[in-house]
């Protein structure tokens, strides 16, 4: 398997992400959308919309409404504009969700598997409050406390090994997997009400080694592979990870923990 030889730590491989996330994260997103009764005319921000595959499903729920599909990654924005070109009620915006400047107030802020990339969530929820209409809603799920803990444990050990440690001297953690009580306090501080925050386990098993490897490489290892100098080194890092998983006798699975949020302004 050839790995993308792109050293940009902050840019996603949008086309590959489209393929590998369709079964896992798209299914979670559908179920999250099902938790709300949609009237069809809501004004919505899809915060961290990525390549826009889930935005299509959201657009069908609000055929008379308006969706702002917001993402900070230029590759994802380009892919989203391609994927969503036929949806007249969707506008794709290149912006970080915590700085998005929208022309009208929102009925709903929807987000699936994205908020954990924002480290300052106090400012994030304060900004969300400013974007919403009175009685506007948050409908959100993302990585919570303990998320993919087993995979990260293996990755951290590899980072400290003689083979790879020189490349991670300046590595910085780029995600935040919070506990429910931490987010409840932030929502209260941002003056939200009817707050519901929960943490649920979503262990995800893959059908074969190739599917597992591609998902891990594209999604889980994104904050790490950019620190490695070339494609060969990235391949070695992924292969070492897979070898550790097999040696440990673990199934080809990821122990996802999902933090769910509903709140009203």
Residue ranges and their predicted role:
Residues 45, 51-99:
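Class I SAM-dependent methyltransferase SAM/SAH-binding core
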Residues 108-121:
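A short SAM/SAH-binding and catalytic strip from SAM-dependent methyltransferases
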Residues 23-40:
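Conserved alpha-helix/loop element of class I SAM-dependent methyltransferases that forms part
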Residues 1-15:
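N-terminal, positively charged/glycine-rich alpha-helical extensions of SAM-dependent methyltransferases
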Residues 101-109:
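A short acidic, Gly/Pro-enriched loop at the edge of an enzyme's catalytic core
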Residues 196-249:
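C-terminal helical/coil "lid" or tail adjacent to the Rossmann-like core of SAM-dependent
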Residues 118-119, 132-134:
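Helix-to-beta-strand junctions that scaffold the AdoMet/dcAdoMet cofactor pocket
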Residues 122, 137-207:
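Conserved catalytic/acceptor-binding region of the Class I
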């Amino acid at each position: 398997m050839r790995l993308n030889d792109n050293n940009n730590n902050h840019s996603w491989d949008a086309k590959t992400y489209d393929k590998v996330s369709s079964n896992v994260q798209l299914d979670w997103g559908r179920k999250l959308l099902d938790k709300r009764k949609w009237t069809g005319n809501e004004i919505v921000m899809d915060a961290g919309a990525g390549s826009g595959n889930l935005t299509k499903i959201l657009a069908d729920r609000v055929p008379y409404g308006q969706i702002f599909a917001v993402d900070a990654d230029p590759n994802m924005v380009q892919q989203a504009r391609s994927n969503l070109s036929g949806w007249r009620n969707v506008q794709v915006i290149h912006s970080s969700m915590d700085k998005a400047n929208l022309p009208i107030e929102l009925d709903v802020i929807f987000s699936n598997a994205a908020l954990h990339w924002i480290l300052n969530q106090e400012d994030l929820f304060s900004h969300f409050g400013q974007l919403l209409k009175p009685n506007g809603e948050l409908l959100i799920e993302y990585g919570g406390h303990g998320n993919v803990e087993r995979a990260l444990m293996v990755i951290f050990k590899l980072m400290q090994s003689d083979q790879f440690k020189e490349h991670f001297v300046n590595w910085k953690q780029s995600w935040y997997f919070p506990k429910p009580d931490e987010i409840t306090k932030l929502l209260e501080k941002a003056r939200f009400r009817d707050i519901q925050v929960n943490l649920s386990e979503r262990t995800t098993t893959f059908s074969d080694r190739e599917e597992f490897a591609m998902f891990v490489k594209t999604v889980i290892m994104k904050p790490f592979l950019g620190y490695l100098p070339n494609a060969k080194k990235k391949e070695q890092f992924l292969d070492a990870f897979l070898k550790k998983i097999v040696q440990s006798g673990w199934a080809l699975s990821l122990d996802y923990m999902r933090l769910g949020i509903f709140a009203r302004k």
